[in-house]
From Swiss-Prot:
Catalyzes the NAD(+)-dependent cleavage of saccharopine to L-lysine and 2-oxoglutarate, the final step in the alpha-aminoadipate (AAA) pathway for lysine biosynthesis. L-saccharopine binds at residues 18, 77, 101, 131, 135, 279-281. Disulfide bonds join 205-249. The active site is at residues 77, 96. It catalyses: L-saccharopine + NAD(+) + H2O = L-lysine + 2-oxoglutarate + NADH + H(+). Gene3D superfamilies: NAD(P)-binding Rossmann-like Domain. The lineage of its organism: Eukaryota, Fungi, Dikarya, Ascomycota, Saccharomycotina. Optimum pH is 10 for the forward reaction, and 6.5-7 for the reverse reaction. Pathway: Amino-acid biosynthesis; L-lysine biosynthesis via AAA pathway; L-lysine from L-alpha-aminoadipate (fungal route): step 3/3. It comes from Saccharomyces cerevisiae (strain ATCC 204508 / S288c) (Baker's yeast). This is Saccharopine dehydrogenase [NAD(+), L-lysine-forming].
């Protein structure tokens, strides 16, 4: 059986410090006979020497573009939209192009033109249809952290100020310490403890959000944990404007009625101050929180909702929340992905990879039909 060569490309998305392969997983894959190249990345949370010590061959950032075709290129986030050259390799990454997101056809056209292949990390599933690896827990954890910080900021600052820029933390403990400090300062102003409504509370993301809320001192009685049972009646829901913080953790797989809308939010009695849209399906035509239109970033974490009644309301819609805790999130994800990566030598027959390839082929066929290729 031919040995597999993986090439870890340097992430190019601003402030993306996570990695699809960690030094830990690199060492384990090399022990299984893999050959691994790692690009030197100035923004990675991992020092390049950690990869070198794990046995990887270090190469310059961007060198994947001219690498031999037999290398499988692995990364996390999408490539720059300004890149249009054909993609000739097999790629493992999150491409965000299977749910009709803005520009999805352009992404797939690059693979079609280069005869490359995409194995989308979002759609690598086990035999039960569950994702083999996801950042959901740390997305929920980080989203809840910023949600509490924004709510607390509003208690201690005037409405003409917005939550300032945030940057990645070295570890979970440091993040929890900062959020707890902000939370206690808010309570010291006389603010009552917030009520937090989480939709999708039973999944990975929801459990991460709940874990953070507990760790910073929000009582469990103040956390409304909604899932399919509570949302089955269909939105919009009157309970959302009456919570102080609303965290959306659902994975959008089909069109649903919106959870809330401007009519519900333009209420002088609204308590809601902060919405955290962890799913951040900003460009999805079926976004269940149609009250904002931009994805926010760490440099500017919130966007104002243009309400006409009630207190100031902001949305946090960062689509790479786990990057707030890049080291722990990467280790967590890479550990779960490892068993599937170990099957790459059998990717023509291993169900997890066969399913991913079929899905890629199906969406490429859609592009070809629409462009009459």
């Amino acid at each position: 059986m031919a040995a597999v060569t993986l090439h870890l490309r340097a992430e190019t998305k601003p402030l993306e410090a996570r990695a699809a392969l960690t030094p830990t997983t690199v060492k384990k894959l090399i022990a299984k006979g893999f050959k691994i190249y790692v690009e030197d990345s100035p923004q990675s949370t991992f020092n390049i020497n950690e990869y070198r010590q794990a046995g990887a061959i270090i190469v310059p950032a961007g060198s994947w573009k001219t690498a031999p075709r037999d290398r499988i290129i692995i990364g996390l986030k999408e490539m720059p939209e300004t890149d249009t050259f054909p993609l000739v390799h097999e790629h493992i990454q999150f491409a965000h192009c299977y749910k009709d997101q803005a520009g999805w056809q352009n992404v797939l056209m690059r693979f079609i033109k280069g005869h490359g292949t995409l194995y989308d990390l979002e759609f690598l599933e086990n035999d039960q249809g569950r994702r083999v690896a996801a950042f959901g827990f740390y997305a929920g954890f980080a989203g809840a952290a910023l949600g509490v910080r924004d709510w607390a900021f509003k208690q201690t600052h005037s409405d003409d100020e917005d939550l300032p820029a945030v940057s990645p933390y070295p570890n979970e403990k440091a993040l929890v310490k900062d959020v707890t400090k902000d939370y206690k300062e808010a309570l010291a102003t006389g603010a009552r403890k917030p009520t937090v409504l989480i939709i999708g509370a039973l999944g990975r993301c929801g459990s991460g959000a709940i874990d953070l809320l507990h760790k910073v001192g929000i009582p469990d009685a103040n956390i409304l944990k909604w899932d399919i049972k509570e949302t089955s009646r269909g939105g919009p829901f009157d309970e959302i404007p009456q919570a102080d913080i609303f965290i959306n953790c659902i994975y959008l797989s089909k069109p649903i009625a919106p959870f809330t809308n401007m009519e519900k939010l333009n209420n002088p009695n609204r308590r809601l101050r902060t919405v955290v849209d962890v799913s951040a399906d900003t460009t999805n035509p079926h976004n269940p929180i149609p009250i904002y239109t931009v994805a926010t970033v760490f440099n500017k974490p919130t966007v104002l909702v243009p309400t006409t009644a009630g207190p100031k309301l902001s949305v946090i819609s960062i689509d790479h929340l786990p990057s707030l805790l890049p080291r722990e999130a990467s280790e967590f994800f890479s550990h779960d992905l490892l068993p599937s990566l170990e099957l790459l030598p059998q990717r023509k027959t291993a169900p997890v990879w066969v399913r991913a390839k079929k899905l890629f082929d199906r969406h490429c066929a859609r592009v070809k039909r629409s462009s009459r290729l």
